[in-house]
């Protein structure tokens, strides 16, 4: 097999033009990235690596001058790349990019995208998760209109293709409401979270070229073989079967890393994009791998018409953290730590979701054996689903079979797509989700530099889960510089509050939170006020206070990454860390103000 050239050539920025080739030059592929000092380095396009067998298997689209047209756009300061795809052809890219359909229909992660869909739909394909597959589908041949003559000329040259799609790099900064990550350039730099530098590399050895990490997406190589099909036939059949029910209620059950959350997003996108105006309620009952919130919560999020767009969830959970419709705080990453509290929180969320009168999609936790089997049985009895989808795991097939026999619902058993072992540990993924949440999706600044809410101590109450034996004098020490849930409760639940020596209104022996969770915050007590680093808005808190609700800050056991407390660029005295330097070699130590010494 003859290898194709690695790129066409660098585009000249002097004038706008449609670039193509004669039919006699079929080996030419797309374009290179501009030099780092070029004006085009701000926002470039797709680069193509040399072909190997893995590209053939995953990306069946054959990049050539016949099916790829490049338009130089001076107004946008970049080049635009259009691809004409045949029916069932696929493109798999690694990186972060935006997609616009100009003609026909494509599927991405179960979502149907056509000319009536938004432009610049964001797709996040990091190394930590299975890669989305763009697949050309059957659809009407209408073409999206453009006032740009050169764009229309490029579309004309691609006539005869089943689909014409434009793929561009994710912009560093964007006002696109579908892009919940507000500053992708900083997010991909490891500016705050050290290990995210590994997320967007186009290959294992190009990490030194920073610009290519966020300015390019690359065709996958042999080392990235985990793929989410654009329209997986087995999954699509189950999704279509569920969609036809008027009031479907679907629970997805399986052990960890078998594709539960992936299928839940797939089903939600399938249902809400297959028919215009459809909404679903995504009920997340997995406090460890939360889809839309920080870890430690169970929640309901409405996806679809007038709510969260299904086109904004085409990526891992940390790329679309958002405020849920309703949430309860569990306080632990693992339901094993407090099964009673977990069940109570789940039941409250389930009851709220049922009241929405929408199709329901339930993502469950990965605890399916022993006591976890009984816990799932309780949840299924409370939900009374129309369908239960089991993601196959040979190690727990017997447990799933027993559960399937006992449920009064339609059962479906799915094989998960082939996947590689997770690149990051569970703890690292929890950290990434937590940090992205606290920063509101913007990692351009350290958390201590972002504006915080300041609330008087008289307006808040403090509780600590499983706090038996905590002395009143130690409450501030136990909660300062930690991650606390921000909850709203009826005032009658806080009548037994006690005042600590620091002036905090403390709820002793705090058990199960019986109120809505508005979000989470890193807390710092400062004199007569408390400072909250949180994406929860001041207007929301003021509305709760105006409604005569109590604001309760609850500490569970959700870890906070230490790099959220310490900005290594500053040194010296900081808001959450103090430095004490004594004489002698090795005597320097830093002390977090929560009272934990680290040498």
Swiss-Prot record:
GO molecular function: ATP binding; polynucleotide 5'-hydroxyl-kinase activity
Keywords: ATP-binding, Kinase, Nucleotide-binding, Nucleus, rRNA processing, Transferase
E.C. code: 2.7.1.-
Protein origin, superkingdom: Eukaryota
Ranges annotated as spanning the membrane: none
Region listing for Disordered, in residue ranges: 1-24
UniProt: ATP binding residues: 254-261
UniProt-annotated location(s): Nucleus, Nucleolus
Keyword ATP-binding: yes
InterPro entries noted in UniProt: Clp1/Grc3 (IPR045116), CLP1_P (IPR032319), P-loop_NTPase (IPR027417)
Record-level GO cellular component terms: nucleolus; nucleus
Enzyme class: transferase
GO terms for biological process, alphabetical: cleavage in ITS2 between 5.8S rRNA and LSU-rRNA of tricistronic rRNA transcript (SSU-rRNA, 5.8S rRNA, LSU-rRNA); rRNA processing
UniProt KW Ubl conjugation keyword: no
Function description: Polynucleotide 5'-kinase involved in rRNA processing.
Stated family: Belongs to the Clp1 family. NOL9/GRC3 subfamily.
Protein name: Polynucleotide 5'-hydroxyl-kinase GRC3
Organism: Yarrowia lipolytica (strain CLIB 122 / E 150) (Yeast)
């Amino acid at each position: 097999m003859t290898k194709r050239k690695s790129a066409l050539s660098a585009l000249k920025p002097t004038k706008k033009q449609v670039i193509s080739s004669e039919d006699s030059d079929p080996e030419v592929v797309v374009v290179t990235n501009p030099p780092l000092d070029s004006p085009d380095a701000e926002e470039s396009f797709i680069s193509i690596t040399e072909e190997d067998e893995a590209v053939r298997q995953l990306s069946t689209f054959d990049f050539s001058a016949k099916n790829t047209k490049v338009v130089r756009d001076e107004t946008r300061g970049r080049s635009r790349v259009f691809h004409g795809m045949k029916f069932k052809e696929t493109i798999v890219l690694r990186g972060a990019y935006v997609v616009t359909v100009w003609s026909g229909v494509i599927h991405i992660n179960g979502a149907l995208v056509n000319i009536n869909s938004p432009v610049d739909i964001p797709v996040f394909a990091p190394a930590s998760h299975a890669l989305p597959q763009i697949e050309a589908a059957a659809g009407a041949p209408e073409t999206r209109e453009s006032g740009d003559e050169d764009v229309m000329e490029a579309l004309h040259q691609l006539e005869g293709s089943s689909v014409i799609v434009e793929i561009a790099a994710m912009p560093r900064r964007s006002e696109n409401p579908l892009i919940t990550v507000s500053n992708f350039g900083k997010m991909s730099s490891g500016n705050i979270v050290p290990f995210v530098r590994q997320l967007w590399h186009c290959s294992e050895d190009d990490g030194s070229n920073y610009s290519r990490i966020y300015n390019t997406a690359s065709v996958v190589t042999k080392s990235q073989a985990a793929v989410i099909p654009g329209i997986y036939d087995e999954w699509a059949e189950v999704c279509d079967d569920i969609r036809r029910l008027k009031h479907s209620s679907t629970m997805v059950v399986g052990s960890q890393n078998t594709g539960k959350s992936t299928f839940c997003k797939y089903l939600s996108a399938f249902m809400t994009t297959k028919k215009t105006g459809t909404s679903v309620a995504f009920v997340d009952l997995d406090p460890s791998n939360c889809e839309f919130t920080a870890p430690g919560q169970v929640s309901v999020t409405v996806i679809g018409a007038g709510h969260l767009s299904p086109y904004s969830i085409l990526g891992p959970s940390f790329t679309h953290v958002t405020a849920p419709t309703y949430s309860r705080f569990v306080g632990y990453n693992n339901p094993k730590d407090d099964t009673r509290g977990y069940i109570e929180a789940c039941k409250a969320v389930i009851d709220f979701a049922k009241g929405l009168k929408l199709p329901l999609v339930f993502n469950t936790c990965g605890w399916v054996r022993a006591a976890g089997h009984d816990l799932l049985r309780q949840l299924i009895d409370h939900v009374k689903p129309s369908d239960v989808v089991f993601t196959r795991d040979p190690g727990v097939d017997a447990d799933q079979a027993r559960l399937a026999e006992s449920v009064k619902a339609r059962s479906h058993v799915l094989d998960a797509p082939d996947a590689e072992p997770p690149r990051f540990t569970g703890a690292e993924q929890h950290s990434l989700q937590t940090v992205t949440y606290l920063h509101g999706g913007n990692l351009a600044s350290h958390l201590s530099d972002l504006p915080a809410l300041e609330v008087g101590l008289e307006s808040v109450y403090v509780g600590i889960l499983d706090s038996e034996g905590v002395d009143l004098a130690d409450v501030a020490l136990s909660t300062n510089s930690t991650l606390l849930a921000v909850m709203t409760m009826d005032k009658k639940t806080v009548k037994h509050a006690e005042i600590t020596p620091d002036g905090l209104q403390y709820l002793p022996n705090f058990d199960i939170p019986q109120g809505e969770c508005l979000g989470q915050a890193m807390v710092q007590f400062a004199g007569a006020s408390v400072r909250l680093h949180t994406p929860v808005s001041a207007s929301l808190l003021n509305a709760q206070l105006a409604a005569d609700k109590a604001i309760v800050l609850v500490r569970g056991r959700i870890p906070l990454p230490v790099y959220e407390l310490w900005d290594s660029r500053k040194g010296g005295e900081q808001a959450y860390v103090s430095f004490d330097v004594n004489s002698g070699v090795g005597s320097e130590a830093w002390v977090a103000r929560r009272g934990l010494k680290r040498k």
